[in-house]
Amino acid sequence: MIKFYYNTAPNPAKVALFLEEAGLPYEPVPVDTRRGEQHSAAFKAINPNAKVPVLVDGATVVFDSNAILLYLAEKTGKFLPAADKRGEMYSWLMFVASGIGP
């Protein structure tokens, strides 16, 4: 089962929305970043950047909300536009990540 490490910030919320809308079963794992749980050795073994969100799918570990969204879209085939429209989707996804994201 997918493990989803998160807090209540906007970037983990994007991933939570995808998981819910796709109907994927997952285990939510809250990370209290206000208390510094992301800096624990156990968490840094999963994500050396010490940030949420992180998705663990079997032996596959993906961090960064947009990387997770793309991984899940490719894995499930959901929410992906036709190949000739993906460039526009990638452009907007990266713009949100680097242009207006938190």
Q: How would you describe each model-predicted region?
A:
Residues 1-102:
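GST-like domain detector, emphasizing the conserved glutathione-binding G-site
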